Amino acid sequence: MKIKSFLWILLFGVFCSNSMAELPKVIAHRGYWKTPSSAQNSLRALELADSIGVYGSEFDVWLTKDDVLIVNHDAVINGMDIESSSSKMLLKQKLKNGETVPTLDAFLNRAKKLSVRLICELKPHKDKQREAVKRIVEMVRKKGLEKRVEYITFSAEGLLELIEQAPKGTPVYYLNGSRLPKDLKSIDAAGQDYHINVFRRHIGWIKECHDLGLKVNVWT
């Protein structure tokens, strides 16, 4: 399959800057998984995203009941709620390509062998949002990947925690589509990371972000 035919599947973010000469950058949403032998948020999807030269590979992180960080999009795996389940049971679950659900530890170990930027989505947790952020940031530090990681989240609490706990200057974007550019600037967020329909309703936000030195990401 030609790259042109599947890039739209991978389009997660369009990164803009004050310089119109800078080309948009593409992020593989949950990795490059729309291909045989791959699956969403799998190690293979991460490797394939790296192989096609996209800017970054996005992945989703949860904290289990016994405080293990795992990579998965949904809050539930085969009927088991991640936040209230033990890692022992969750890590036995298989992805569509036969891999087991990866821990963040395993995911970052594989990432260390690659060069693609890592776009870590902190999932909204019911009770342990601060603890999840603490453990994610610490693991990224221990793996020596701080300069390659950017964070995104739908959680208002998680956004503030990431900005507070991650090293100063680490890009942290808000996904929820509700905060004004000036509000994000005031808390040192990197910019807006909103669905395309949000920008259709608020087209002026793009210029406002750029005028404030913020970046704009678009997903569909």
Regions found by a protein language model. Name each.
Residues 2-3, 21:
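Terminal accessory/targeting
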Residues 18-220:
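Phosphate-group recognition and catalysis centered on beta-loop-alpha active-site segments
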Residues 3-5, 30-31:
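Hydrophobic alpha-helical segments, especially transmembrane helices
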Residues 4-15:
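Sec-dependent N-terminal signal peptides
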